[in-house]
A protein has these predicted regions:
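Helix-rich terminal scaffold detector
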Residues: 75, 85-122
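Compact, glycine-rich, soluble single-domain proteins
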Residues: 1-85
Length: 122
């Protein structure tokens, strides 16, 4: 049982053997999140190709009032298997420019030919 605000790491009883060049990503189930406030703390959880242990999922109950019970066999997460490319990083003195530059969080979509909605009413 996950009490409100509690987190716990749950064993799935499953293990996989991914081939080199692939990774698996453990993600929340949308129904658990929408209906019960259950999510995965480190979403997505990454499973590397070399890992051979039991898949475990750290769940968090974000509901402020209701506990959530988990039984053996419950579907608590989804697994996405995806090909991955190993990047090789090269140190450089500077980076080429881009339309976004160094603008950070919340800046995507601004200054790209969109009209300003500042002062507009809905």
């Amino acid at each position: 049982v996950l009490a409100p605000g509690e987190r716990a790491t749950i064993g799935t009883g499953c293990a996989i053997a991914l081939p080199d060049g692939f990774a698996a990503f453990v993600v929340p189930r949308s129904g658990l999140a929408a209906k019960h406030g259950i999510t995965i703390v480190n979403s997505p959880g990454t499973v590397d190709a070399g890992y051979r242990g039991e898949l475990r999922v750290t769940l968090l109950n974000t509901d402020a009032h209701e506990s959530y019970s988990i039984a053996v066999g419950d579907r608590i997460a989804q697994l996405i298997i995806w090909p991955v490319v190993r990047a090789r990083f090269v140190p450089v003195e500077s980076l080429p420019g881009s339309h976004r530059g160094q603008r950070g969080f919340g800046s995507t979509g601004y200054g790209e030919g969109l009209e300003s909605t500042e002062g507009a009413s809905a």
